[in-house]
From Swiss-Prot:
One of its GO terms (cellular component) is membrane. Catalyzes the N-acylation of UDP-3-O-acylglucosamine using 3-hydroxyacyl-ACP as the acyl donor. Is involved in the biosynthesis of lipid A, a phosphorylated glycolipid that anchors the lipopolysaccharide to the outer membrane of the cell. Its EC number is 2.3.1.191. The active site is at H229 (proton acceptor). The lineage of its organism: Bacteria, Pseudomonadati, Campylobacterota, Epsilonproteobacteria, Campylobacterales. The keyword Lipid biosynthesis applies. This is UDP-3-O-acylglucosamine N-acyltransferase. Belongs to the transferase hexapeptide repeat family. LpxD subfamily.
Length: 317
């Protein structure tokens, strides 16, 4: 799609060469044939280092656009990006190609195997499983009944995916119009699970917008957990039931998230940190500490001291 067509579709004005755009991508990873966007001053610092051929940007940030990068100036770059994401979304089904199923793998009846799927030696795919196009499953995995693994997702060796979990569904991403409409952002990334990962029943892990949602090796995820788009979980994390991680949350290695805990988006939790049940992570947290509470979350010993003071206060009164 030419920049002039994109400008017409989004109501943007543009300066620079009317180049052909083949995909949308992040500022970090875009190339000369791709379009990116910047929705605020926080991300404007990344524009100079980007290789994007063009960028959706608001008028007040155009000074950050380097020479050689075309600027599509619009009132709401995030909304313009959402509108375009449908046009650049990957197709639901790709061109049919043969799949590579290892001889020692077991595929039970009623499992759907898409195009160009790979299933490693010794893996078991149970009844009712859906494997989308280009899915790769390693060796000795057990994929339990009714698991859904959407297109392009990668499952490492020795993984257990329990019944009804969903890997690689679209993330919960929308842009909003002035009249209150919510415009869907189509996600072109995927989910990558390392080795020895376990995903509990009815857990959902969303695909990234452009890149991968990453679950590193030896991480264990309980039932009924929601992991948002572009999250990154380090080695050996333990995620207890009903935890919810908002998009782009980053957990270091061996982080423990207690039951019904959660995180706001774009926060980082350091290695070996532990979040107590119902803890709410709203800011970056240091490595190796225990935390509790929600607003604000705090070190566990401080939380207990405050609870004791509250109890003494009510006993006196």
């Amino acid at each position: 799609m030419k920049l002039s067509e994109i400008a017409q579709k989004t109501g943007a004005s543009f300066s620079g060469e009317d180049i052909e755009i083949f995909a949308l991508n992040s500022l970090k990873n875009a190339n000369k044939a791709e379009l990116s966007y910047c929705d605020g001053e926080k991300n404007a610092k990344f524009i100079a280092g980007s290789n994007a051929g063009a960028i959706l940007i608001s008028q007040n940030l155009t000074s950050f656009v380097p020479e050689g990068m075309s600027a599509l100036v619009c009132e709401n770059p995030h909304l313009a990006f959402a509108i375009l994401s449908k046009d650049f979304a990957k197709p639901l089904f790709c061109e049919p190609k043969p799949s590579n199923i290892a001889e020692s793998a077991t595929i039970m009846s009623n499992a759907y195997i898409g195009s160009n799927v790979s299933v490693g030696e010794g893996s078991i795919v149970m009844a009712g499983v859906f494997l989308g196009d280009n899915v790769k499953i390693g060796q000795n995995c057990i994929i339990h009944p009714n698991v859904v693994i959407y297109n392009d997702c990668v499952i490492g060796d020795e993984c257990h995916l329990l019944a009804n979990c969903v890997i690689g569904s679209d993330g919960f991403g929308y842009a909003h119009t002035k009249t209150g409409e919510h415009v869907k952002i189509y996600h072109n990334g995927n989910v990558v699970l390392g080795d020895f990962v376990e995903v509990g029943a009815c857990t959902t892990i969303d695909r990234g917008v452009f890149e991968s949602t990453m679950i590193a090796s030896y991480t264990k995820i309980d039932n009924l957990v929601q992991i948002g788009h572009n999250c990154e979980l380090g080695n050996g994390c333990l995620i207890v039931s009903q935890t919810g991680l908002a998009g782009s949350t980053t957990l270091g290695r061996n982080v423990v998230m207690g039951g019904q805990s959660g995180s706001a988006g774009h926060v980082r939790v350091g290695d070996f940190a532990q979040i107590a049940a119902r803890g709410g992570v709203s800011k970056d947290l240091d490595a190796g500490k225990k935390y509790a509470g929600a607003y604000p979350i705090m070190p566990l010993d401080e939380f207990f001291k405050i609870q004791a003071k509250i109890l003494r206060f009510f006993k006196k009164n």
